[in-house]
């Protein structure tokens, strides 16, 4: 999860987020090399006496600065497209959960069970227990099995929302009248926090998301109690 004065991304918990972190590092290195080259050229221009000021044409230089950016864009685009296709894949999900955004809370329905659904509201600051996180705790967590593919069906009942959990690499728009889908798989147990990431009204900041990833045996016990 996030911490105060954090500069980097959250620790990855899913394979998709691992890929996103690698892509971030890959792109950042390219940006660093380009920035270094530009700063080097600027320093040369400031410290070196200019020559060939009357030159009006340089075919070789123009060829290089046309081809080189194209190669750089390809090096960025190919891994990006690979990750985009990975994020759109739905690989035989073991469980499906329908998420509906409201002003200003989330409701969840486990579609593989007959009567397993609930609303999830933020716990007000004055009701928090010691150690709980302000603006992030909810009264009903979304309990899911770890190391299993879970499909999330996401929609909205009123205005645009966005269901996002950074450590899992998830961010999907909740649009009224439309059902979007995404998949998640957590590689380790724990609590993973997210928030609505689309401005949806005055209480937009009070729509947290809490996923509790647990072993399959614990999930089966929890679902039996809830049903």
Swiss-Prot record:
Membrane topology: Multi-pass membrane protein
Source species taxonomy: Eukaryota, Metazoa, Chordata, Craniata, Vertebrata
An annotated GO BP: ATP synthesis coupled electron transport
Record-annotated membrane-spanning stretches: 15-45, 60-87
Binding site for Cu cation A2: 196, 198, 200, 204
GO (cellular component) term, any one: respiratory chain complex IV
Keyword Cell cycle (UniProt): no
Name of protein: Cytochrome c oxidase subunit 2
Function summary: Component of the cytochrome c oxidase, the last enzyme in the mitochondrial electron transport chain which drives oxidative phosphorylation. The respiratory chain contains 3 multisubunit complexes succinate dehydrogenase (complex II, CII), ubiquinol-cytochrome c oxidoreductase (cytochrome b-c1 complex, complex III, CIII) and cytochrome c oxidase (complex IV, CIV), that cooperate to transfer electrons derived from NADH and succinate to molecular oxygen, creating an electrochemical gradient over the inner membrane that drives transmembrane transport and the ATP synthase.
Assigned keywords, A-Z: Copper, Electron transport, Magnesium, Membrane, Metal-binding, Mitochondrion, Mitochondrion inner membrane, Phosphoprotein, Respiratory chain, Translocase, Transmembrane, Transmembrane helix, Transport
Cofactor notes: Binds a dinuclear copper A center per subunit.
Residues bound to Cu cation A1: 161, 196, 200, 207
Ranges in the topological domain labelled Mitochondrial intermembrane: 1-14, 88-227
Organism annotation: Lycalopex sechurae (Sechuran desert fox)
Subunit structure and binding partners: Component of the cytochrome c oxidase (complex IV, CIV), a multisubunit enzyme composed of 14 subunits. The complex is composed of a catalytic core of 3 subunits MT-CO1, MT-CO2 and MT-CO3, encoded in the mitochondrial DNA, and 11 supernumerary subunits COX4I, COX5A, COX5B, COX6A, COX6B, COX6C, COX7A, COX7B, COX7C, COX8 and NDUFA4, which are encoded in the nuclear genome.
Family: Belongs to the cytochrome c oxidase subunit 2 family.
Modified residues annotated as Phosphotyrosine in this record: 218
Amino acids binding Mg(2+): 198
UniProt-listed PANTHER family: CYTOCHROME C OXIDASE SUBUNIT 2, CYTOCHROME C OXIDASE, SUBUNIT II
Keyword Transport among record annotations: yes
């Amino acid at each position: 999860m996030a911490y105060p004065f954090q500069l980097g991304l959250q620790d990855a918990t899913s394979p998709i987020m691992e890929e996103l972190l690698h892509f971030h590092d890959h792109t950042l290195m390219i940006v660093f090399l380009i920035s270094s080259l530009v700063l080097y050229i600027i320093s040369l221009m400031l410290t070196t006496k200019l020559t060939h000021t009357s030159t009006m044409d340089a075919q070789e230089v123009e060829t290089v600065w046309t081809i080189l950016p194209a190669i750089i864009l390809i090096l960025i685009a190919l891994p990006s497209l690979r990750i985009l296709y990975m994020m759109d894949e739905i690989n035989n999900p073991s469980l499906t959960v329908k998420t509906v955004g409201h002003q200003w809370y989330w409701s969840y329905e486990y579609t593989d069970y007959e009567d397993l659904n609930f609303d999830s509201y933020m716990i007000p600051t004055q009701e928090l227990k010691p150690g709980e996180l302000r603006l992030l705790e909810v009264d009903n967590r979304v309990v899911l099995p770890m190391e299993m593919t879970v499909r999330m069906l996401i929609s909205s009942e009123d205005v645009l929302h966005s269901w996002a959990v950074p450590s899992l690499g998830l961010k999907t728009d909740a649009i009224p009248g439309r059902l979007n889908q995404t998949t998640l798989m957590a590689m380790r147990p724990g609590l993973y926090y997210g928030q609505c990431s689309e401005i949806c009204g005055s209480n937009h900041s009070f729509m947290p998301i809490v996923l509790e990833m647990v072993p399959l045996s614990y999930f089966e016990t929890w679902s039996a109690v809830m049903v």
